[in-house]
Structures are given as C-alpha cells and as structure tokens.
C-alpha cells in the first residue's frame, strides 16, 4: 500500500507514477474522500470543544446552585451529533482504505518506460544457445514420448492444467527442488522455511493478492482459507504485525512449496506443456531489509536465482520489466527468461522484485533501527529461485538427444542417484 501522506502531499507525483503503469484514472475520488474526512474531523473537533465548554459551564452553574437543564439538554444533542459524525468518519476512512488498497506501487525511477512486455529491456545474456543436428522438439512431446509426464491422466483425474509426473520425471522434479534448496541455504545463506499451503485473507491482503486478484486465487468455500499462489505469501506474512530488531536485518528466507493459481486471465494461453499449470512447484527467495539496502539486495537476489540456471547449464537472459508490465506490488522487477529451443523462444522462469515498503505497510512489518529509535517499515523482496516445472521443461528441451533421450545436467547427477540420462519409462 502506498503511503497515504505521500498521496495527500503530492497527488500529481503519484498520478504521474501511476500513469507510467498505463493507469489513466486520476486520484480525484481519493482526494474527494480525503477532503470529506478532513471536513468531518474539523466539525467533530469543533463540537467536542463546544461540549467541553458547556460541561465546564454546567459545572459552574451547578456549583452556584443555578439551573443547568437547558445546557444539559443541548449537550445531549451535541453528544448525539458527535456520535453520528464519528460513524461517518469511520465509514469514510474505510472507503479511503479500500481506495488505497486498489492502488499499485509506484515504479522506481530506474524502471524503463513502456506499457507492455514488448517494452521490457534486456540487461544481460548468459550461455550459448544449443545447436542441434535435428529439429528440436517441445518439452511436452519429449515428456510424453519418454513417459515421464502424463498430461492425459492429469486431465482425467483433476482437469485441464494438471499433470502426473512419473518415474524419472518425478525424480527430476524432486532432484531440482533439493538442488535449489541446498544451493540457496548452503552457499547463499538463506534460512529454509517450510510454510503452510493455505493462508487467511489477512495474509493475502498483506502481500497484495487481495482484494484486486481474488479471481486468480483458489478460495476454500465457507472459510477464510486460500490456497497459496506462491510461498511469497506465507513467508512474507511470517512477520506480519511484528517489529523486528534492526540488527537482525537483512533476513533471508527460502521456501519450497506447491503453488495454486486459477489462471483466470490465461484462457487459451500455454494450453500445452508445463509452462502454465493450476498446481506447480516453486522454490521462493524472500528478503526483509533496511530501506537503504533494498536495491543492492535486489541485485544479489537476482544473481542468486541466476546461479541456479548457470549451474544447470541453461542459457537465459535477464530482462528489466517496463513500468506497464510490473506486478501490482512491485517497484522494480527483473525477469529471468530461459531459452526453450523446442519453441525457439525465451520463457520466464523467475521474477525478482523489490516491493520497497508497499507490502510492509499492508502487513505492518517494521524494524527498530536502534534501542531508542522509532520503528520503521522494512523493505520486502522476493524472487523465484526458481520455478521447478519450467526448469524441468527447459532441461528436457536443452538437453534432448536425437534418439529422444535426455541427458542429466552434471550438477543434478548427485541428486539423481548418478543417473546420466532419462530413458523411456516402461509401463
């Protein structure tokens, strides 16, 4: 959530930031509500002052034995009016809060201008694109021929955008999870968290999924539970409503979880393969930092995610998202896009974002800089470290052989029991 004081003091600057995202709607309704709130507060304050004066006059009259009946009656009327206005103030403040919850974060000054992914800016490339002496196949075709992913039975048992991994496919998925967790905990210094797969609405609001993206979430009917769309939600909310000791920052957490997304806006997109599933696995990196350190920490977090792809030998590029392509809560985002030779394109495999104090304000996550200093909002960051199913897809396409088998990347062999290649599964 944006700082309401900034919106009040610099509405033109906030409107310019929102316009960079392609949001033409101004802040007129917010400013109108805020003015109404201020007018109500002025009226309430005036009535309370009057009530205090009348109370003093009533006390004086009673002390001198005079009749104060009329003043007492008028004071009752003032009290009723104050009560009525207090209700109006609460209603306007709630409406203001709902307006603030709808506003996305303001893009950082370093974010490129633009309104769609066509305006995103490549930052760097890593690795050489593989060359094949045959026509490379897409990962879903490779997986089906090897018998390691069952798309048809996934659809039968659960519906579209669900799959079964089997045999070496299931083993590869598990190997990648363990490989990523070991890299981030042992080498990069993250503390592992194993979070709940369901959270309450306060947690969804804290990270920015609610109220705007309710239709993209799986909600357990009749309860306050939501299936998590990413481990970012439970791990960020780990410290919701808390004041962290300043000396503990930065805090680095890594979490593996299954993720659940309705993909309400993705009808007709990526209907084949592992790229867009309702349920998928991901290893997530989450950081809590001091405000002055957060952009340096974003660069580190991005490099930590990149190392996964480098160790697996998967060519990729880093792209800075333009203002119009940023996620709702992000102030700046780098996407890692892995090369997919079967479809001859780069596909997102990780998003690494700095949310500044946007999530922390919604979730009330603060830190105390020093023993006698006032608490301040932390900055939160997160990034995929990385999406597991998409990594499986990238390995199948980049390590495919002409005979239909797939080589195991050297870094994964210890996690695959020494297996050097994936051969067709036997029914």
From Swiss-Prot:
It comes from Moorella thermoacetica (strain ATCC 39073 / JCM 9320). It catalyses: tRNA(Ser) + L-serine + ATP = L-seryl-tRNA(Ser) + AMP + diphosphate + H(+); tRNA(Sec) + L-serine + ATP = L-seryl-tRNA(Sec) + AMP + diphosphate + H(+). It is found in: Cytoplasm. The keyword tRNA-binding does not apply. InterPro entries: aa-tRNA-synt_IIb (IPR002314), aa-tRNA-synth_II (IPR006195), aa-tRNA-synth_II/BPL/LPL (IPR045864), Ser-tRNA-ligase_type_1 (IPR002317), Ser-tRNA-synth_1_N (IPR015866), SerRS_1_N_sf (IPR042103), SerRS_core (IPR033729), tRNA-bd_arm (IPR010978). The keyword Ribonucleoprotein does not apply. L-serine binds at residues 230-232, 284, 384. This is Serine--tRNA ligase. Catalyzes the attachment of serine to tRNA(Ser). Is also able to aminoacylate tRNA(Sec) with serine, to form the misacylated tRNA L-seryl-tRNA(Sec), which will be further converted into selenocysteinyl-tRNA(Sec). Keywords: Aminoacyl-tRNA synthetase, ATP-binding, Cytoplasm, Ligase, Nucleotide-binding, Protein biosynthesis. Its EC number is 6.1.1.11. The lineage of its organism: Bacteria, Bacillati, Bacillota, Clostridia, Moorellales. It is an enzyme of class 6 (ligase). Transmembrane segments: none annotated. GO terms for biological process: selenocysteine biosynthetic process; seryl-tRNA aminoacylation.
